Amino acid sequence: MFHKFISTLTNKKITQTIMGTINKENIKPAMLLSAFGDACGYKNGIWEFEKSPSRIYEHYEYLGGYKNLKINKKDWRLSDDTIMHIATAIAITRPTNTDNESICKELAKAYIHSMEDMAGRAPGIQTINSVSLMTQTGMRSKVYQWNEIDFSDRAGGCGGSMRSMCIGFKYWSDEQLDTLIELSIESGRITHNNPVGFLGALVSALFASYAIRSIPPKTWPLKLMTEVMPKAREYLEKTSNSSNRNIENYEKGWNYFWNSWKSYLKLRQIPSNPDELKAANDKGIDYPVFPKDYSDYKVRENFYHSISFSGWGGSSGHDSCIIAYDALLGSADNWEEMIKRSVLHGGDNDSTGAIGCCWWGALYGFNGVPECNYEKIEYKSIIEGLAKEISN
């Protein structure tokens, strides 16, 4: 299904408009390195479901390190993360899109079609259940529309955050912020109707939009907490109803997501409001601040575990983005370090890898990345074609 959506439009390196500057050349690396992070973390199910980081590191070293990770369909197939990220990219680039609702309908269709290619890719239960409700079958009396999935306390997983990054590449400017907020939230809420889940989709897309503009990563949370979260709240109130999207049902999840980010930012001494920014500048704090022993993967593993909802770091909407962001901050432009921090851990590492490596690619392109990491990756031509479409 994917090939028919691909065009042959030419990508341009830098585009300057009245809306600002975007490094379009890095959309392709971002999309491909996201797929790398997914395929590497998944490792055909071997690494994603390995809870021991020591065993993952032993296997990684046995393979010869990142310069010898020859990603290919047989040994490193893509998981559900990238298949659904591809689906998101297809939906937002459809020529028939006229408004946000039409795009949301396309998102639902694309997610339904993506289920045809999920054998051996370990899709999440919440995604499977939601998509099945939107799928026409002979025995189903009601087929749910894209905005009819019920609210659930159990829908806070990372299924939304792992697939929304490309929305930030399509709607990257300040003038498009409202569209980014609405579409990223809905891209997650289509299957994960819980703030912990769909706000993760918002952060993934938002930070991608910052990365593709080369906005310094340490400034992202201030913009998230002061500019974007209030707008997201307004949108949820505007779309609230008395049934499946009641704002009152969202309070617990909203607060959990907000407090999780506040706690993380306090830990790293990253400002989350103007007063904290002024205080940090007055005190000369060089943030983010990491523990001295944070280069030890065991120390990172304990932290990833501590912020998770269920003990599996990165499996929810909040911690998938926090871990990916933490890895990005700690790695700077070092590709190997990004792999170690975002992918090589005992949690939901294909999702944190897909998100974090996407942001990294948007910032740094293929700088220092061995070609073997992506040259034979599954669906490479499709991903490249969609990157061109998004750049258009």
UniProtKB/Swiss-Prot annotation:
**Record-annotated residues binding Mg(2+) 2?**
348, 350-351
Entries under Pfam families matching the protein: ADP_ribosyl_GH
Q: How is the cofactor bound?
A: Binds 2 magnesium ions per subunit.
* EC annotation from Swiss-Prot or TrEMBL: 3.2.2.19
Reaction it catalyzes: N(omega)-(ADP-D-ribosyl)-L-arginyl-[protein] + H2O = ADP-D-ribose + L-arginyl-[protein]
> What positions does the entry give for Mg(2+) 1 binding?
79-81, 350
Which InterPro entries does UniProt cross-reference here?
Answer: ADP-ribosylglycohydrolase, Ribosyl_crysJ1, Ribosyl_crysJ1_sf
Class of this enzyme: hydrolase
Which biological process terms from the Gene Ontology are attached to this UniProt entry? Answer: protein modification process
| Key words of the record | Hydrolase, Magnesium, Metal-binding
Q: What residues bind substrate, as annotated?
A: 109, 159
Q: Can you tell me which family this protein belongs to? A: Belongs to the ADP-ribosylglycohydrolase family.
Official protein name in the record: ADP-ribosylhydrolase ARH1
Give the species this sequence originates from.
Dictyostelium discoideum (Social amoeba)
